């Protein structure tokens, strides 16, 4: 279901929600990936229970990848750079 701000809802051992966003690239662990405005807003609202599963070196033929998890102080571990802008024509 798109638009929720995360991909997978899980729970920790105490039953608290854990919101998981999965980001996959064929490139290295440092290859850029994209987060939507909605995903960033959800991350900021759920800092203690949000994590990003970063899959990289993805091989389609074997459906395999390397992985690490960003889950504590995510904003301090990533750089966000705007890459697109919404454009609206002004009324004249």
Task: Indicate where each model-derived feature is located.
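Acidic, glycine-rich loop-and-strand cores that form catalytic or ligand-binding grooves
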Residues: 13
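Short, surface-exposed beta-edge/turn micro-motifs
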Residues: 5-6, 16-17, 48-50
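Core nucleotidyl-transferase/polymerase catalytic module
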Residues: 1-3
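Non-catalytic C-terminal interaction segments of nucleic acid-processing enzymes
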Residues: 46, 75-92
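Conserved catalytic cores of phosphodiester-cleaving nucleases, focusing on short active-site segments
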Residues: 7-10, 18-24
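Catalytic cores of nucleic-acid endonucleases
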Residues: 22-73
């Amino acid at each position: 279901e798109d638009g929720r701000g995360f991909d997978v809802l899980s729970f920790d051992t105490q039953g608290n929600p854990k919101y998981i966003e999965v980001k996959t690239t064929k490139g290295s662990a440092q290859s850029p990936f994209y987060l939507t405005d909605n995903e960033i807003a959800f991350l900021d609202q759920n800092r203690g229970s949000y994590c990003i599963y970063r899959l990289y070196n993805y091989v389609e033929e074997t459906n395999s990848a390397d992985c690490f998890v960003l889950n504590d102080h995510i904003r301090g571990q990533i750089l966000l750079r705007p890459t697109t802008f919404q454009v609206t024509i002004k009324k004249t």
